[in-house]
């Protein structure tokens, strides 16, 4: 069965073809990054219009890449939510119209479920069950995943998502949009412990997270540096040091919470998905992750246990059609009536989990 996947939740237009027997056949992506850069952020109306312009050419590009035709498509999957309303409608309208024309089922997909399952597109796939860290510009959540459609929310950010905190901190430092990736790049040149920022909620007993206070700590440090220098500009090395300290704090919190989730569930496999999953520091830290089962005071310590960690291929960390095509393929037979164009800009993942 050949499934066409369509992603249009924000500022990337993704189209892909996934074959249930042969795997991913084609993957095409257009990013609107340059278009939104001059505005310093995503402009929803512009995003929607650009999706409309890109969907047909990207679909035809995927078909050519796979050596297939419209008649070979067996189902159409699309991102129903969450995301920008207009952007979602662009993808939904196209998906439903195409499915209607082809007389094929249409499969609505939750955007976060697409990210959650994206590591299964890699050659080396994780086995169920596993702890999943969904970390992006819009969401930071820790899930227990026991199988396709069997997800339990363990914890999440109570305010800013980690990726959002990266972007907002980058803006505080005067970095160009989108700043999160640039911040990570500059952090590579930062000196260890030149600045030390708090790790919010790192010692809380639950798996909740918070990053807004960390952003405030960066602002305080930036204002202090500017006051000391008597200028708005921040010295290059100081800026790099702040970037490193911020990134270290975020990664430390994420790692600590995931370790707690592993101890809570008893799982020893971790999957990291979402845009921040491409972060080099995060990959390095999680790649060396171990857990140690706590022991009563005075008792011999348990040996540390190595954790198996899986990341999606870098190309599938950002929003993409491949993850939607794959998730749709996993839900074949559950398509809703063709012609139902509703989208869900706000759609908690808890509504599809058991």
UniProtKB/Swiss-Prot annotation:
User: E.C. number, please?
Assistant: 2.3.1.234
Q: Which Pfam families match?
A: TsaD
Q: Which GO terms describe its cellular component?
A: cytoplasm
Cross-referenced SUPFAM superfamilies, in alphabetical order?
Actin-like ATPase domain (SSF53067)
Essential cofactor(s): Fe(2+)
Q: Which UniProt keywords apply?
A: Acyltransferase, Cytoplasm, Iron, Metal-binding, Transferase, tRNA processing
Q: Where does Fe cation bind?
A: 111, 115, 319
Where does the record place it? Cytoplasm
Give the protein's function.
Answer: Required for the formation of a threonylcarbamoyl group on adenosine at position 37 (t(6)A37) in tRNAs that read codons beginning with adenine. Is involved in the transfer of the threonylcarbamoyl moiety of threonylcarbamoyl-AMP (TC-AMP) to the N6 group of A37, together with TsaE and TsaB. TsaD likely plays a direct catalytic role in this reaction.
What's the name of the protein?
tRNA N6-adenosine threonylcarbamoyltransferase
State the organism of origin: Neisseria meningitidis serogroup A / serotype 4A (strain DSM 15465 / Z2491)
Question: Encoded by which gene?
Answer: tsaD
